[in-house]
Amino acid sequence: MKHLASSIALTLLLPAVQAQQTVWGQCGGQGWSGPTNCVAGAACSTLNPYYAQCIPGATATSTTLSTTTTTQTTTKPTTTGPTTSAPTVTASGNPFSGYQLYANPYYSSEVHTLAMPSLPSSLQPKASAVAEVPSFVWLDVAAKVPTMGTYLADIQAKNKAGASPPIAGIFVVYDLPDRDCAALASNGEYSIANNGVANYKAYIDAIRAQLVKYSDVHTILVIEPDSLANLVTNLNVAKCANAQSAYLECVDYALKQLNLPNVAMYLDAGHAGWLGWPANLGPAATLFAKVYTDAGSPAALRGLATNVANYNAWSLSTCPSYTQGDPNCDEKKYINAMAPLLKNAGFDAHFIMDTSRNGVQPTKQSAWGDWCNVIGTGFGVRPSTNTGDPLQDAFVWIKPGGESDGTSNSSSARYDAHCGYSDALQPAPEAGTWFQAYFEQLLTNANPSF
């Protein structure tokens, strides 16, 4: 369940060696100086501001969430005066209803420039389709926050140009000091011992500034994967025990500062195999409800995000053997067991679930806690509000499929033993860097298929 800033310096500048670009070649995007015309039978399709591609007989498309009957109320943005005086979008009900989600340009560029060149021709159209699926942008280092502004500006421009339905921004806030306290693969940039709490608050302030600047852009945030769940089950780990007060202070600060009219937030809540056990449900609900009330019951905190970067099913008729007797063996059972406890404690929460890598069920995990680059997985259900459960706001893609969970190199400083298990695909690169074999696995096993 790991994600870390990639060290790969992506470049979208490819050599112009012919007047017309071949099928699947790049034909446009910011900074592109090569061919802009495609060979006969292909059309130059703009996938994002940074990348256009020659696709056979295709035109650019946007992915729209199919919506439920829950209504979304917005104030229409004006077409003048961008930036600090932008009109404010306000939301009520399901924050996904009535919006299409933003396709992550960075992930799209990874797919097109890293994955597709080495894929067999039969998989290239499928990979191109994956690049168009909206996935969350991870703000896993402070240096990425300005890029958030770039994306919000792009969304603002598209919405003013008449995007219908309007586009919502989707981001993961993920930079706690002493991050990933119970594992090693995704340790972050801040240390509690080295001014980490103050640095984190500055990071949150920078995110808030972007959200205020683009107050006419509806934005959905997932807050700190793997943080509060560790405070439920892993306080026996010294690093987690030492981080407890800092985690709570930092998450409280984030919830208060990002409680804005144009924002909807979901706190990370692990998954069924972590907090869904009967012994963990009560303590988890108590913690989440206390965090909610301590932050002043922020209106923007819609609920909890589950299965982030994990592989669990939404609903199973039979519990797999690796769930080891947990009655809440899928995410639907988990949230329906958790929700009443939260409500009784004053937090009327709704949920979202990451389905980016849960297309194959049952999984090939040897144990339910095996989280690193699990073999045999596939892309799952595309983003949708058609969940069939009033507690579940949406299925979404939070983890960018194809980015590694962690390295299998045991000599690495960030090596975690889970990444060397027999059910982890190997050899694997560092967390957050591109893992071509894993992307191909997800693509080949996608359910529904591309």
Swiss-Prot record:
Signal peptide bounds: 1-19
Main location: secreted
Coiled-coil zones: none
Annotated transmembrane regions: none
All copies of domain CBM1, residue ranges: 20-55
Region (Disordered) location: 63-89
Localization: Secreted
Keywords: Carbohydrate metabolism, Cellulose degradation, Disulfide bond, Glycoprotein, Glycosidase, Hydrolase, Polysaccharide degradation, Secreted, Signal
GO cellular component: extracellular region
PROSITE patterns on file: CBM1_1, CBM1_2, GLYCOSYL_HYDROL_F6_1, GLYCOSYL_HYDROL_F6_2
GO molecular function, one term: cellulose binding
Alphabetical GO biological process terms: cellulose catabolic process
Residues at the active site: 180, 226 (proton donor), 405 (nucleophile)
Domain of life: Eukaryota
Its job: The biological conversion of cellulose to glucose generally requires three types of hydrolytic enzymes: (1) Endoglucanases which cut internal beta-1,4-glucosidic bonds; (2) Exocellobiohydrolases that cut the disaccharide cellobiose from the non-reducing end of the cellulose polymer chain; (3) Beta-1,4-glucosidases which hydrolyze the cellobiose and other short cello-oligosaccharides to glucose.
Domain remarks: Has a modular structure: a carbohydrate-binding module (CBM) at the N-terminus, a linker rich in threonines, and a C-terminal exocellobiohydrolase catalytic module. The genes for catalytic modules and CBMs seem to have evolved separately and have been linked by gene fusion.
Protein name: Probable 1,4-beta-D-glucan cellobiohydrolase C
Source species taxonomy: Eukaryota, Fungi, Dikarya, Ascomycota, Pezizomycotina
